[in-house]
Amino acid sequence: MGRHILKHVFAVGGIYCSFLTWGLLQEPLNTRVWPNSGCTFQVPYIVALVQATIAMICGLIYIKWQKPVLSLSKFWTSHTRDMAIISLSQAISAPLAAYSLSYVDFLTYMLAKSCKLLPVLMVHLIVYRTPIPRSKKLVVLLVTVGITIFTLDGHKPSMTENDVSESSSSSSLIGFVLLGSSLFLDGLTNAKQDKLFQKATYKITGAHLMFALNFFLIVWNVIYMVLVDRQQLAKGLKMLHADPEISRYLLAYACCGAIGQCFIFYTLEQYGSLVLVMVTVTRKMFSMILSIIVYGHQVTLWQWVGIVIVFTGVVCESMGKKNKAKEGNIINEEKVKQS
């Protein structure tokens, strides 16, 4: 009994420690104006490349430690095409989310990325034409209302700021289009992962996904920077040379993300999706609160109301999963994505 509790604390504590630190590193890495470079580190494909490289190495170590029944070579030959397609949506989603930070504040970004149900339902409704239950529609309504309240109250125009307000509204719209596109691709990734698990003839573990998806993320990011945007690599290297502190943030951020993925898959395999969902929801709440405290974000009363409404919707969705678990119909909706 004591050993079981220690394993549980180890799994949950690992997720909290790695992803709370990951969240605290993500904000300055993406939004800080670095002193010597004089600009933000807006090179998302380099960030994704470094993170994927470290995560792939961790995934390989995880496979060696886990020794799954399905060998890596057999998994590779059977699911190469699936991994390439799933990773492509991930490779596009992450930079879109990073670019959205040029137009929306970090708390809005975190709040939107906390709502995994929205993109999943969008994909099932638009792509797979799946009927949406009334309970999920209610959750979507709560989340949408909460984000709207949070965003609108954070952009109240004063009587003498009409021109600035119009410019801000236009920028916010661009930010939400980018963020919404990223969320839709996240939903597409999760839906394709669900299909992969359903059709698999052998048990696919988190370690398999972690290694293969990150391998293809490296491939896609390298292809993009070589064929489409060579300036991004040059800009990134120039900034890393001018501000060496960025490299420390970047490596720490990537390591926390990779370690966090290991803990997510470990928790999923040991305790199931229900425990993982509850840990993920509370972790995201604490990440927002920690960001507000550490970085001194000003949050109005109505914005707090918006945050509470959003997480009420997310908790309702988690409770719905709990009821399904009791009926023996757990649907695995938490795979590779971190908040």
Curated annotation (Swiss-Prot):
Protein's recorded name: UDP-galactose transporter homolog 1
Keyword field contains Endoplasmic reticulum: yes
Entry GO MF terms: UDP-galactose transmembrane transporter activity; UDP-glucose transmembrane transporter activity
SUPFAM superfamilies: Multidrug resistance efflux transporter EmrE
One family name in Pfam for this protein: UAA
Keyword Metal-binding: no
InterPro entries, per the entry: SCL35B1-4/HUT1
Signal peptide, first to last residue: none
Entry keyword set: Endoplasmic reticulum, Membrane, Sugar transport, Transmembrane, Transmembrane helix, Transport
PANTHER family linked: SOLUTE CARRIER FAMILY 35 MEMBER B, SOLUTE CARRIER FAMILY 35 MEMBER B1
GO cellular component, one term: Golgi membrane
Name of the gene encoding the protein in the UniProt record: HUT1
The protein's role, per its UniProt record: May be involved in specific transport of UDP-Gal from the cytosol to the Golgi lumen. Involved in the maintenance of optimal conditions for the folding of secretory pathway proteins in the endoplasmic reticulum.
Lipid bilayer topology: Multi-pass membrane protein
Sequence similarity: Belongs to the nucleotide-sugar transporter family. SLC35B subfamily.
Species of the source: Kluyveromyces lactis (strain ATCC 8585 / CBS 2359 / DSM 70799 / NBRC 1267 / NRRL Y-1140 / WM37) (Yeast)
Compartments where located: Endoplasmic reticulum membrane
TM region(s), chain numbering: 5-25, 43-63, 91-111, 138-158, 171-191, 208-228, 246-268, 273-295, 301-321
